[in-house]
Structures are given as C-alpha cells and as structure tokens.
Amino acid sequence: MKERILVTGGTGYIGSHTVVELQNSGYDVVIVDNLSNSSADVVDNIEKVSGIRPAFEKLDCLDLEGMDKLFTKYPGIKGIIHFAASKAVGESVQKPLLYYRNNLVSLINLLELMPKHGVEGIIFSSSCTVYGQPDVLPVTEEAPIKKAESPYGNTKQINEEIIRDTVASGSPINAIMLRYFNPIGAHPTALIGELPNEIGRAHV
C-alpha cells in the first residue's frame, strides 16, 4: 500500500512540483490549499504531468476543525510537507497581523493534530530570510540567525522555534526545516510553474 503524504499549499509553485515528484516516486498525495494565490486548475495540470490525480481539498490550514476532519477522511497520513503560507515580504510589512495569523496558526494547528492522527513527520518550508543580512557570502547552513528584516521573515524564525520547542517537549514528531532561496523556472512541460492569481487574471 502506498504511503500517504499531505502537502499543504500543494497547488502553489513549489508545492505542485513537489506533488509531481512524490507521485512519480510512488506516494499517495493529498493536497490542501485555500487557493488564495493559486488555482484549482493546477490539480488538472498535475494529473497531466504525472498521470495521477492527487486528492485535493480546498481548505484553509487555519480551520482547525476542518483540518481535523481531513485527517479523519484520509487516514494513514505518514508525513506533512507544509508549504502553505503568506509569502510576500513587502506585503508582510503592510499587513503584519495577516502574516502572523496565517503563518503561525497554520503550523500550530498541524502540530497539534499530528499526534492525534498518528502523523509521524513534518517538513517545514522555512526561508533564507531567517539569516537576515549575512556577514559572509555565500550563506551556509551554519550561518547565524539574524534579526528578521520583515514580518514574513520573523514568522519563519518563530515557526522554526515553535517546531524546536514542540520536538523538545517530547512530542512524537520528527521535523525537517528547509531554508531555501527564491526558486525560479517551470516544469519542462510548462504545465506547472509560477503563476500567481493576480498575474493570471491580468492575462485573461
């Protein structure tokens, strides 16, 4: 039986590519996305690329009750890859409370639900912004964490601390945090790539 993975933000740029790779590697994938910056059409394109249609639920990770029901609907989820987040540095300066609510509460909800539903691991999509203005280039994993320069960056730093504290408390969770820089490009098929809703609407 295939291992089941939950991908939050799975219709986004990085999420959709990850879903394709997971399916090509033999995993059963469930996507959760509120479609705030993407389209359900991405699910169709994922199917065209991989030949497999992933399960998709339009749902906000802030909805604790809804997420609880999702884990019940899709039993046996082994791990979560958590991409769902508000992600624009400039917007985070203008709307800090939106970013703190979306980015912190969504993670907390997942961490609270994981032990209840026997989910063993989470990969958290952090960011290079946790390094602030680095002293030395290129930046390595050993670079010190600096004061965040935006609410967005601060949410990523706080989320990392939440994960560390949760694991240190004895919670039965394994966690990996990815601090990557801005990804670019598109799938060779050109069926999935970066196309935020605002840009898509501008070209209609």
Regions found by a protein language model. Give the residues of each.
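N-terminal Rossmann/SDR dinucleotide-binding element
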Residues: 2-79
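Active-site beta-alpha loop architecture of Rossmann-like, nucleotide-cofactor-dependent enzymes
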Residues: 38, 86-90
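Catalytic helix-loop patch of NAD(P)-dependent Rossmann-fold dehydrogenases
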Residues: 94-112, 116, 121, 130-182, ...
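Short beta-strand segments
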Residues: 31-32, 58, 124-126, 176-179
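Conserved small/polar residues in nucleotide/adenosyl-binding loops
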Residues: 202-204
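Conserved NAD(P)H cofactor-binding loop of Rossmann-fold oxidoreductase domains
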Residues: 84-87, 126-127
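N-terminal Rossmann-like NAD(P) cofactor-binding module of classical short-chain dehydrogenase/reductase
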Residues: 78-81, 123
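Glycine/Thr-rich phosphate-binding loops of Rossmann-like dinucleotide-binding domains
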Residues: 15, 90, 132-133
